[in-house]
Amino acid sequence: SIAQLKHLGLATGIYPLLDVVVERADSAFVQVALADTDRRVGEGKPVAPSFLLACVLWADVREGWAARLARKDHPYPALQDAIDEVFDARIGDVSGRGKLAADMREIWMMQPRFEKRVGSVPFGLVEQPRCRAGFDFLRLRADIQEVDERLADWWQEFSMASDAEREDLVQAA
Protein backbone atom coordinates (compact mmCIF):
# COMPACT_ATOMS: atom_id res chain seq x y z
CA SER A 1 0.00 0.00 0.00
CA ILE A 2 1.01 3.63 -0.43
CA ALA A 3 0.92 4.17 3.34
CA GLN A 4 3.32 1.28 3.89
CA LEU A 5 5.72 2.58 1.23
CA LYS A 6 5.70 5.98 2.94
CA HIS A 7 6.25 4.36 6.36
CA LEU A 8 9.25 2.44 5.04
CA GLY A 9 10.69 5.53 3.39
CA LEU A 10 10.38 3.94 -0.04
CA ALA A 11 7.63 6.13 -1.44
CA THR A 12 9.78 8.41 -3.59
CA GLY A 13 12.92 8.41 -5.63
CA ILE A 14 12.89 4.76 -6.73
CA TYR A 15 10.86 5.07 -9.88
CA PRO A 16 9.56 8.41 -11.22
CA LEU A 17 6.09 7.05 -11.96
CA LEU A 18 5.84 5.68 -8.42
CA ASP A 19 6.50 9.24 -7.23
CA VAL A 20 3.45 10.37 -9.21
CA VAL A 21 1.31 7.60 -7.69
CA VAL A 22 2.34 8.67 -4.19
CA GLU A 23 1.87 12.35 -5.04
CA ARG A 24 -1.65 11.67 -6.33
CA ALA A 25 -2.70 9.04 -3.79
CA ASP A 26 -5.01 11.47 -2.01
CA SER A 27 -6.89 12.60 -5.12
CA ALA A 28 -10.44 11.27 -5.39
CA PHE A 29 -9.90 9.75 -8.83
CA VAL A 30 -6.72 7.92 -7.86
CA GLN A 31 -8.35 6.69 -4.65
CA VAL A 32 -11.28 5.13 -6.53
CA ALA A 33 -8.85 3.66 -9.08
CA LEU A 34 -6.70 2.12 -6.35
CA ALA A 35 -9.79 0.78 -4.55
CA ASP A 36 -11.01 -0.73 -7.82
CA THR A 37 -7.56 -2.25 -8.38
CA ASP A 38 -7.64 -3.78 -4.89
CA ARG A 39 -11.09 -5.21 -5.64
CA ARG A 40 -9.91 -6.71 -8.93
CA VAL A 41 -6.84 -8.26 -7.30
CA GLY A 42 -9.05 -9.68 -4.54
CA GLU A 43 -11.30 -11.25 -7.16
CA GLY A 44 -8.32 -12.77 -8.96
CA LYS A 45 -8.84 -10.56 -12.02
CA PRO A 46 -5.93 -9.15 -14.00
CA VAL A 47 -4.79 -5.56 -13.53
CA ALA A 48 -3.15 -3.72 -16.42
CA PRO A 49 -0.38 -1.34 -15.34
CA SER A 50 -1.34 0.90 -18.25
CA PHE A 51 -4.86 1.31 -16.85
CA LEU A 52 -3.59 2.29 -13.41
CA LEU A 53 -1.05 4.70 -14.90
CA ALA A 54 -3.78 6.20 -17.09
CA CYS A 55 -5.75 6.86 -13.90
CA VAL A 56 -2.78 8.37 -12.08
CA LEU A 57 -1.83 10.66 -14.98
CA TRP A 58 -5.38 11.61 -15.95
CA ALA A 59 -5.30 14.86 -13.96
CA ASP A 60 -2.31 16.06 -16.00
CA VAL A 61 -3.95 15.05 -19.28
CA ARG A 62 -7.28 16.61 -18.29
CA GLU A 63 -5.63 19.91 -17.30
CA GLY A 64 -3.63 20.11 -20.52
CA TRP A 65 -6.68 19.23 -22.57
CA ALA A 66 -8.85 21.83 -20.81
CA ALA A 67 -6.21 24.53 -21.39
CA ARG A 68 -6.14 23.73 -25.10
CA LEU A 69 -9.93 23.68 -25.34
CA ALA A 70 -10.01 27.09 -23.64
CA ARG A 71 -7.79 28.33 -26.50
CA LYS A 72 -10.45 26.98 -28.89
CA ASP A 73 -8.31 24.10 -30.17
CA HIS A 74 -10.25 21.25 -31.76
CA PRO A 75 -11.07 18.60 -29.12
CA TYR A 76 -9.27 15.53 -30.50
CA PRO A 77 -5.99 17.21 -31.52
CA ALA A 78 -6.10 19.09 -28.20
CA LEU A 79 -6.36 15.81 -26.33
CA GLN A 80 -3.58 14.24 -28.44
CA ASP A 81 -1.29 17.19 -27.69
CA ALA A 82 -2.09 17.06 -23.97
CA ILE A 83 -1.29 13.34 -23.93
CA ASP A 84 2.01 13.87 -25.75
CA GLU A 85 2.95 16.58 -23.27
CA VAL A 86 2.23 14.29 -20.31
CA PHE A 87 4.19 11.42 -21.85
CA ASP A 88 7.18 13.68 -22.43
CA ALA A 89 7.04 15.12 -18.91
CA ARG A 90 6.14 12.04 -16.90
CA ILE A 91 7.14 8.92 -18.76
CA GLY A 92 10.21 9.86 -20.78
CA ASP A 93 12.24 6.86 -21.92
CA VAL A 94 10.75 4.25 -19.58
CA SER A 95 11.24 0.76 -20.96
CA GLY A 96 8.00 -0.45 -22.46
CA ARG A 97 6.68 3.05 -23.04
CA GLY A 98 5.46 1.96 -26.45
CA LYS A 99 2.89 -0.52 -25.13
CA LEU A 100 2.13 1.56 -22.04
CA ALA A 101 1.69 4.67 -24.14
CA ALA A 102 -0.49 2.95 -26.72
CA ASP A 103 -2.83 1.48 -24.11
CA MET A 104 -3.04 4.68 -22.07
CA ARG A 105 -3.58 6.84 -25.16
CA GLU A 106 -6.37 4.55 -26.32
CA ILE A 107 -8.15 4.74 -22.94
CA TRP A 108 -7.86 8.53 -22.85
CA MET A 109 -8.86 9.06 -26.48
CA MET A 110 -12.03 7.04 -25.91
CA GLN A 111 -13.28 9.43 -23.23
CA PRO A 112 -14.68 12.13 -25.55
CA ARG A 113 -16.03 9.43 -27.86
CA PHE A 114 -18.18 8.09 -25.00
CA GLU A 115 -19.99 11.43 -25.03
CA LYS A 116 -21.27 10.69 -28.55
CA ARG A 117 -24.21 8.33 -28.35
CA VAL A 118 -25.68 8.92 -31.80
CA GLY A 119 -25.14 7.47 -35.25
CA SER A 120 -22.52 4.79 -35.71
CA VAL A 121 -20.11 6.01 -33.01
CA PRO A 122 -21.39 3.76 -30.19
CA PHE A 123 -21.39 0.68 -32.43
CA GLY A 124 -17.80 1.25 -33.54
CA LEU A 125 -16.57 2.13 -30.09
CA VAL A 126 -18.03 -0.94 -28.40
CA GLU A 127 -16.13 -3.13 -30.90
CA GLN A 128 -12.74 -1.65 -29.97
CA PRO A 129 -10.47 -4.15 -28.17
CA ARG A 130 -9.85 -1.78 -25.26
CA CYS A 131 -13.42 -0.52 -25.00
CA ARG A 132 -13.92 -2.28 -21.67
CA ALA A 133 -10.85 -0.55 -20.22
CA GLY A 134 -12.08 2.76 -21.60
CA PHE A 135 -15.51 2.14 -20.12
CA ASP A 136 -14.05 1.16 -16.73
CA PHE A 137 -12.14 4.45 -16.80
CA LEU A 138 -15.36 6.32 -17.64
CA ARG A 139 -17.13 4.54 -14.78
CA LEU A 140 -14.45 5.69 -12.32
CA ARG A 141 -14.86 9.24 -13.63
CA ALA A 142 -18.61 8.95 -13.02
CA ASP A 143 -17.97 7.61 -9.52
CA ILE A 144 -16.32 10.93 -8.58
CA GLN A 145 -18.88 13.01 -10.52
CA GLU A 146 -16.38 14.08 -13.19
CA VAL A 147 -18.93 12.93 -15.77
CA ASP A 148 -22.64 12.32 -15.47
CA GLU A 149 -23.48 8.96 -13.92
CA ARG A 150 -26.21 8.52 -16.54
CA LEU A 151 -23.56 8.50 -19.28
CA ALA A 152 -21.75 5.57 -17.65
CA ASP A 153 -25.07 3.81 -17.02
CA TRP A 154 -26.03 4.22 -20.68
CA TRP A 155 -22.76 2.69 -21.84
CA GLN A 156 -23.09 -0.16 -19.36
CA GLU A 157 -26.52 -0.95 -20.75
CA PHE A 158 -25.37 -0.51 -24.36
CA SER A 159 -22.40 -2.83 -23.91
CA MET A 160 -24.63 -5.64 -22.66
CA ALA A 161 -27.55 -5.11 -25.05
CA SER A 162 -28.54 -7.07 -28.14
CA ASP A 163 -28.20 -5.39 -31.54
CA ALA A 164 -31.90 -4.45 -31.56
CA GLU A 165 -31.70 -3.06 -28.02
CA ARG A 166 -28.61 -1.08 -29.00
CA GLU A 167 -30.51 0.50 -31.89
CA ASP A 168 -33.26 1.50 -29.44
CA LEU A 169 -30.73 2.97 -27.00
CA VAL A 170 -29.11 5.06 -29.73
CA GLN A 171 -32.52 6.27 -30.89
CA ALA A 172 -33.46 7.23 -27.32
CA ALA A 173 -30.17 9.06 -26.73
Predicted regions and their residues:
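Conserved, hydrophobic alpha-helical core segments of structured domains
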Residues: 1-170
